Amino acid sequence: MRIGILGGTFDPIHYGHIRPAMEVKASLKLDNILLMPNHIPPHKNTTHSSTAQRLEMVAQVCEALTGFELCDIEAKRNSPSYTVVTLKQLSRLYPDDELFFIMGMDSFIHLQSWHKWQQLFELANIVVCQRPGWHLAEGHPMQHELSARHATLEALSHSSAPQHGRIFTVDISPQDISSTQIRSQLAMGEIPQDALLPVTLNYIQKQRLYFS
């Protein structure tokens, strides 16, 4: 199987996470997407809801969407959510499957600052979500890596055996949604219905999350 992996704080999970994941799933013909909430994000100190609440919100989204599953291995880990550690664990859990780690271009351009970043290519393929027409600047430190490892969707369609170490770029529809914006709206008593799945909004309202 081809398995996509999308990690995040998901505080809360919203369409800005879900729609790009669905577009990647369709473009790369992935069988499944693992939605993976972080427990202790390396670059963030606090969250606005508990780990249990974020897990429940993601679990409910996965129940509502076909081909999405909750992955709680980072949430259960009592250490920082370093991607290389997670991918090693997932490689052991899915030894016969092909893993596709999904990230935005804003994360990819800073990939060299990640913990043991070069080992990521030994464990999975990297999927970089980008806005249509956007290109990495010539001379950028990650340009060589992108050029050397870039693979086309056509090459993927002719691939049968699981592989890793390739970079796929997928154009996605712009999503003007952020968790920060949603939390601010809720704190002011506004209901961001267009940004959240109904099941997520219902859970937030029942739990009184993010309300002042």
From Swiss-Prot:
A GO BP annotation: NAD biosynthetic process
Keyword terms of this UniProt record: ATP-binding, NAD, Nucleotide-binding, Nucleotidyltransferase, Pyridine nucleotide biosynthesis, Transferase
Keyword Transferase: yes
InterPro entries noted in UniProt: Cyt_trans-like (IPR004821), NadD/NMNAT (IPR005248), Rossmann-like_a/b/a_fold (IPR014729)
Top-level lineage group: Bacteria
Residue stretches spanning the membrane: none
Molecular functions (GO terms): ATP binding; nicotinate-nucleotide adenylyltransferase activity
Associated pathway: Cofactor biosynthesis; NAD(+) biosynthesis; deamido-NAD(+) from nicotinate D-ribonucleotide: step 1/1
The reaction(s) this protein catalyses: nicotinate beta-D-ribonucleotide + ATP + H(+) = deamido-NAD(+) + diphosphate
UniProt-listed Enzyme Commission number(s): 2.7.7.18
PANTHER family cross-referenced by the UniProt entry: NICOTINATE-NUCLEOTIDE ADENYLYLTRANSFERASE-RELATED, PHOSPHOPANTETHEINE ADENYLYLTRANSFERASE
Protein's job: Catalyzes the reversible adenylation of nicotinate mononucleotide (NaMN) to nicotinic acid adenine dinucleotide (NaAD).
Annotated NCBIfam families: cyt_tran_rel, nicotinate (nicotinamide) nucleotide adenylyltransferase, PRK00071.1-1, PRK00071.1-3
HAMAP family listed in its UniProt record: NaMN_adenylyltr
Family, per entry: Belongs to the NadD family.
Record protein name field: Probable nicotinate-nucleotide adenylyltransferase
